[in-house]
């Protein structure tokens, strides 16, 4: 498994705005990127920085996505830095869409 982290200037001014914007494109990431396991977006309102974390099944899948024109354009337009990591262990795993019982 491969972990990829992108850092860039915040895409939206608040976490609520980022959530509303990114929820529109979640289906693309769920269906159109081979080998992608999950992908959260994050923002830090205090620092004005944003991040995306990708988990891929393998390096070939990660490289295919990050070499795509869409990703190259995003990184160029947003001065994004990118770093790849081999995943050594996972501490906890559950679906994000799981409903919590009260």
Which residues make up each language-model segment?
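Residue-level marker of structural boundaries
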Residues: 70-71
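Short loop/helix-cap segments at secondary-structure boundaries that form the rim of catalytic
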Residues: 74
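Short S/T/G/P-rich N-terminal loop/turn motif that feeds into the first structured element of a domain
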Residues: 1-49, 57-67, 77-102
């Amino acid at each position: 498994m491969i972990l990829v982290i992108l850092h860039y200037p915040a895409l939206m001014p608040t976490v609520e705005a980022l959530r509303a914007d990114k929820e529109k494109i979640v289906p693309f990431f769920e269906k159109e990127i081979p080998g992608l396991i999950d992908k959260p977006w994050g923002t830090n309102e205090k620092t004005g920085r944003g991040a995306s974390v990708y988990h891929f099944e393998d390096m070939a899948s990660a490289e295919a996505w990050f070499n795509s024109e869409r990703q190259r354009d995003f990184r160029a337009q947003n001065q994004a830095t990118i770093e790849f990591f081999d995943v050594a262990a996972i501490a906890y795993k559950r679906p994000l869409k799981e409903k919590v019982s009260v």
